[in-house]
Amino acid sequence: MMTLVPRARTRAGQDHYSHPCPRFSQVLLTEGIMTYCLTKNLSDVNILHRLLKNGNVRNTLLQSKVGLLTYYVKLYPGEVTLLTRPSIQMRLCCITGSVSRPRSQK
């Protein structure tokens, strides 16, 4: 079991280095953290992203995996929901332990 999120879809005619559609980030905010269970034949793809933060350029190495999606689990605070889906091929962006998450304000 791996914790992954689907890579953002790009607009038609753009490659994976182009800016993704804004809808993807909105989905992450409303749908919670998604944990995917993948079948065999995973391929690792490492992509070097250049991020601009506070005027400073920072390079980040992101690991992606390509495989068959069998099902996924939606995780909310205090709730786990298993959702079945037909097996489809997707590229998934791995969430590593180095990813910082914003703290929730009470």
Swiss-Prot record:
Gene Ontology biological process terms from the UniProt entry: single fertilization; spermatogenesis
Domain of life: Eukaryota
Tissue expression remark: Expressed exclusively in testis. Expressed in ejaculated spermatozoa of germ cell. Expressed in the nuclei of spermatogonia, spermatocytes, and round spermatids, except elongated spermatids (at protein level).
GO cellular component: nucleus
Recorded coiled-coil stretches: none
Residue ranges of the TM segments: none
GO molecular function terms attached to this record: HECT domain binding
Subunit structure: Interacts with MAP1S. Interacts with UBE3A (via HECT domain).
Protein name: Testis-specific basic protein Y 2
Gene name of the record: BPY2
